[in-house]
Amino acid sequence: VFEQVRRDSALLGELDLTLRVTLDTHVHADHVTGAWLLRQRTGSRIAISQDSGAEGADLYLSHGGRVEFGQRYLSVRATPGHTNGCASFVLDNEAMAFTGDCLLIRGCGRTDFQQGDPHVMYRSVRNEIFSLPDDCLLYPAHDYRGLTASSVMEERAYNPRLGGQLSESDFVGYMNNLHLAHPRKLDIAVPANLKCGAPEGDTVPMGDPDWAPLNFNFAGIWEINPDWLEEHRAQVQVLDVREPDEFTGPLGHIPGAILIPLGALQHRTDELDKERPVVAVCRAGGRSAQAINVLQQAGFAKAANLPGGMLRWRSQGRRVEGGAS
């Protein structure tokens, strides 16, 4: 998802993973894919079905093809019905499959627009997904109830649209009478996804903060580079959210730091200047991460955490006031 690329990039960095390929299961209608932006940030390739109608991909996939990574691969299964270009991806040992919007958990993708066809959908699920081993885990593109995985055995038995003894005519009758409203982002998402998520003019609209060299972690917190902070302390407000005895204790504190314990911060944010950046610090970086959430809720647009806190700051031999010598 385009808006989640920063989060996804953070996870890749934290786990020291290299993104080789971004697989789009189809041209989505309810959100814009992050494939293009991920390619801009990581150099990954974009892969999508050759029947999708999308432009700008690096790999166009066909039924029976493979997407290789390391010593493993995903096999490509064409599963149209939601759209013409829907594809599902099955791990080489058939232990798991990624079904896009073809088969959802106790449901399936809609078939009433974007080349949708309930007859085709029924056959795709029955022939390409329900034919997998019972214990094959199924991961759909999304789920509106917060679920993440099911299995072939479960869906074959309990899917209220496609499971059990339901026939093709049963399924077609069900799908033709859903009477769903069109997705809210339809007019934005489909044109963008037909370009693999590339924005107009190929300009990146999600610029990172530029007031300091920051890193966005998977927990959703901006973190500041300690070297930059030491050199530019006068340009920011250093907020120490420890308790008073810690502030004057063995670790000392960063020169010029403002002491506001985390428990009091929500009611004392007016002691800080919203126009100037704030860097939060604590003993090890945990409380100060929560301080960033408090500051953002109070309207501070420029706020970052000092990872590792005073423990790391002291261990690197950086300047402090007070503390043990």
Regions found by a protein language model. Name each.
Residues 1-19, 55-146, 151:
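Catalytic core of the metallo-beta-lactamase
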Residues 2-47:
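Active-site metal-binding motif and surrounding structural segment of the metallo-beta-lactamase
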Residues 47-54, 242-246:
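Short, polar loop motifs at secondary-structure junctions
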Residues 47-50, 100, 141, 306:
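Generic beta-sheet signal
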Residues 202-280, 323:
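Positively charged, proline/Ser/Thr-rich regional signature most characteristic
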Residues 262-315:
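Catalytic cysteine-centered active loop of the rhodanese-like fold, especially the PTP/DSP P-loop
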Residues 317-325:
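Active-site neighborhoods of enzymes that stabilize oxyanions during catalysis
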